[in-house]
Amino acid sequence: MSRIHPTAIIEPGAQLHETVEVGPYAIVGSHVTIGARTTIGSHSVIEGHTTIGEDNRIGHYASVGGRPQDMKYKDEPTRLVIGDRNTIREFTTIHTGTVQDTGVTTLGDDNWIMAYVHIGHDCRVGSHVILSSNAQMAGHVEIGDWAIVGGMSGVHQFVRIGAHSMLGGASALVQDIPPFVIAAGNKAEPHGINVEGLRRRGFSPDAISALRSAYRILYKNSLSLEEAKVQLSELAQAGGDGDAAVKSLVDFVESSQRGIIR
């Protein structure tokens, strides 16, 4: 029995694994590739130069691979690449990249993308990320693995959200959130280390303690950013379980272009 509903439109050139399921009135464009066991909900549109991996579930009325909302876009064949085992719920929009950046929007593996989320052009979303309903990512946003973005939050262009961090609901984020940090508010401010998330991910008590010390250096000790960087670099060489985590935080802060929330 066919897994493609008779009312669905599969344009010539589209490459679908034989196990892909496509629901009623969905449209799959001619430059789309979809891997095994992925399901496309009714009325969804998958278009553009889009590659989708295996075991993904795309909900009803999703728009995946649409043109970038960038006035500089001139129909260049930019791309969207989605990994495996992602859940993308109803009315989500994910756009392809632009030539002004890398030309590709990416979504990793095992992500949970809730209803009405927007992932703009050139975004780079890692793996195991949760984007809650109505979270809105502007263009060029980077989100690290295991990060969580609360519902109805807005993220400014080019902002980075570090791995294992959490942005509370209804927040406005205009600068980078370092890894492991909780932020919330309009505009978003730091509110401690994501201790519960780190415990769930298997971080040791010593590593969590080191990250708490790093947070105090960065936010609680009335240090300038340059002074804090020096002390954080020293902490990253303490010889404990938390060295690697603190080092990743230091590297993130050092590489920030928009500045970190502070």
From Swiss-Prot:
This is Acyl-[acyl-carrier-protein]--UDP-N-acetylglucosamine O-acyltransferase. Pfam families: Acetyltransf_11, Hexapep. PROSITE patterns: HEXAPEP_TRANSFERASES (PS00101). It is found in: Cytoplasm. GO terms for molecular function: acyl-[acyl-carrier-protein]-UDP-N-acetylglucosamine O-acyltransferase activity. It comes from Burkholderia mallei (strain ATCC 23344). GO terms for biological process: lipid A biosynthetic process. Belongs to the transferase hexapeptide repeat family. LpxA subfamily. Pathway: Glycolipid biosynthesis; lipid IV(A) biosynthesis; lipid IV(A) from (3R)-3-hydroxytetradecanoyl-[acyl-carrier-protein] and UDP-N-acetyl-alpha-D-glucosamine: step 1/6. Its main location: cytoplasm. It catalyses: a (3R)-hydroxyacyl-[ACP] + UDP-N-acetyl-alpha-D-glucosamine = a UDP-3-O-[(3R)-3-hydroxyacyl]-N-acetyl-alpha-D-glucosamine + holo-[ACP]. CDD domains: LbH_UDP-GlcNAc_AT (cd03351). Keywords: Acyltransferase, Cytoplasm, Lipid A biosynthesis, Lipid biosynthesis, Lipid metabolism, Repeat, Transferase.
